[in-house]
Amino acid sequence: MWRLYRKTPKQLRNSVESCFKSVNSRQFSVSSFSAVAKDDKSVLKQQEVLHLLAKDQRFEERFFNQVQQTIRYFASKPNDLKKFFRKEASTDNKESSSSSDKKDSKGNKGEDNNPFNQFPGGWQQIAVSVGILLALYAFMDYQSYREISWKEFYSDFLEAGLVERLEVVDKRWVRIVSSSGKYAGQTCYFNIGSVDSFERSLGAAQHHLQYDADRQIPVLYKSEFNFKREIPNLISVAFPLLFGYYIYRMLKGGGAAGGAGRAGGGGLGGMFGGFGQSTARVINREDIKVKFADVAGCEEAKIEIMEFVNFLKNPQQYKDLGAKIPKGAILTGPPGTGKTLLAKATAGEANVPFITVSGSEFLEMFVGVGPARVRDMFSMARKNSPCILFIDEIDAVGRKRGGKGGMGGHSEQENTLNQLLVEMDGFTTDESSVIVIAATNRVDILDSALLRPGRFDRQIYVPVPDIKGRASIFRVHLGPLRTSLDKTVLSRKLAAHTPGFSGADISNVCNEAALIAARDANHEISNKHFEQAIERVVAGMEKKTQVLQKEEKKTVAYHEAGHAIAGWFLQHADPLLKVSIIPRGKGLGYAQYLPKEQYLYSKDQLLDRMCMTLGGRVAEEIFFGRITTGAQDDLQKVTQMAYSQVVKFGMSEKVGPLSFETPAPGEMAFDKPYSEATAQLIDQEVRDLVMNALRRTRDLLLEKRSDIERVALRLLEKEILNREDMIELVGKRPFVEKNTYEEMVSGTGGLDENVELPKGLENWNKESEKKKKDEEKKKNDE
């Protein structure tokens, strides 16, 4: 407090300290204050001020009244206050000030009637002055008061007979008015719980000290405004009001949220990171290194996206036929199939502005931010039209309305979705060339109004690549890798060994192969590194240091041998590539199969898959007479396959040709779409189906018991067996197999993916000749 006090202007300190002296000496008046204001030498030391204040017990009342008189004096004589804020008060200034005072007293009609506008700083200087006075008042009030306990009051005042009267202030504390004693020069007080308890305690104390009626201590009850005690209450009321006013000024200064694009950057947006402004970014074409040549495995989807770019580059080609440019397209498909990569390639190839934003960026903690950002985003897009607007993960904002989950954030999400619908195709939507492209892997949860033609005219499905698509993707990712292998042959081989892999998985395999080669200090990548990379992606990291007991290792060997033999002698099971008892990931063993490219499955094919999956558990039971927990994952897979046959595919005779919708993994099922009786029937059918597969597997493995034992012993010896080892141990599979890339793609129209463009898109990346001529003519005219 005194640090703030010492930083005040010298004249103001002089006047305040002289004011303190005048109050305590009972000689203060407005005229004396005016005289003191002109005296630069009347400065008291801090200790003297405290000493003078401590002598006067009624300082609080008189000083607070004097603050009010001081403010009134400042208002009537602003020129006196002007001296307080000057570094040096010269004689000329004093004379001019006195002359101006005379003019003011006589009344000068030519000056402003508002006294606060007649000196520099105006209200700000008065506020600072009053604040310093009130702060000093609270500080001095704190210095002159001393809190004591009831015991001290009893011993130092009541027993000594020094109490003149007691003042109960606001029914909360008691001020002691005494003539002299131990605490001379200070006002002592103590807090009370309630007035009733205080009166009982005081009466008992006076009775104990045998105070007669003449000596009874008078008690006064009064209410006072104590600035120091009311500061917390004032702050609790003033702070929310000031904060609300500050927010209002920020909003007013920043303009209507989203209404003016990015013009209102100085308002609340600066404090809350954009607030109503869109976080969409305009991508510079030179910053994007991805081109359409880098996108493979989804040629149909790529052609669709190329056509959108061609709409903007050569619109006349379509307008001549009366066609309208589509409003937008939504890319759907499983994760990792290249939806965002297609958008990046579009940004790298298009000669029009490309604006990108994430769906989650629309929703913030403030209500109304989402719709405001949608408006601002489309305002930006229209200013840059023709352009492409890409919204990634649109399911964050485009969920179906009226769903079950929600509360307050759900309503905000719906408002944002409504604004998005209006901006894409609403009453005020113009015909500007803004194409919206969105991406999501949860198209099933999107609102139907968002997917209708007129908003997203096309739904482009980007599937997991087939064997030809995988070969094309491998060629792209093998390009920068250092290897002496033929990359075309290698890409086809790897494509055959990675069924079901997405583009992201293939990219990860190539990168892992390079990392493994670098770890082994090799100068190039070989076949071995790619095989290890595939195993790492499929089954996890190899754990050679994990210690297995001899009995556990033997159990794992027979378990994996059971899988291998069951799959080897079942016609519709997948061909075996490799089996290992080296722990990987969460499993203690690992078997790699080669599934064929197949989209339709019969009941017999699904049954063979179930039998192959149960082979490990049955082998443990046959050779050890017991079962272990190692088959838990196998049982989960078998149960899922059985339920799918009964509930989804209608392959149960008792349940009939019915298909019920089941919740997706991770979703909660609040109710079942069938009755309890049907549920019991389904459970019984699933149990019968699994038990039938178990009996069939047991019969097969009992017949091939010697083959299982040979494979298990070789696994304990070598730990890893490949297809050639299996042929050596048990002979060739008794079924026709397709193991090479050429065998798998035979009869599909060629070895490689068809990348031929439609005739209308052959020049998609070239400006139309007419447009070029118009631009050249315009330049010549200029």
UniProtKB/Swiss-Prot annotation:
Residues in compartment: Mitochondrial matrix: 1-118, 252-782
A GO BP entry: mitochondrial protein processing
Mode of membrane association: Multi-pass membrane protein
Keyword entries, A-Z: ATP-binding, Hydrolase, Membrane, Metal-binding, Metalloprotease, Mitochondrion, Mitochondrion inner membrane, Nucleotide-binding, Protease, Transmembrane, Transmembrane helix, Zinc
Subcellular localization(s) per the UniProt record: Mitochondrion inner membrane
GO cellular component entries: m-AAA complex; mitochondrion
PROSITE patterns to which the protein is assigned, alphabetical: AAA
Name listed for the protein in its UniProt record: AFG3-like protein spg-7
Species the sequence originates in: Caenorhabditis elegans
Function (record text): Acts as a component of the m-AAA protease complex which is an ATP-dependent metalloprotease mediating degradation of non-assembled mitochondrial inner membrane proteins. The complex is necessary for the assembly of mitochondrial respiratory chain and ATPase complexes. Functions both in post-translational assembly and in the turnover of mistranslated or misfolded polypeptides. Plays a role in male tail tip morphogenesis.
Molecular functions per Gene Ontology: ATP binding; ATP hydrolysis activity; ATP-dependent peptidase activity; metalloendopeptidase activity; zinc ion binding
Residues the entry annotates as binding Zn(2+): 559, 563, 634
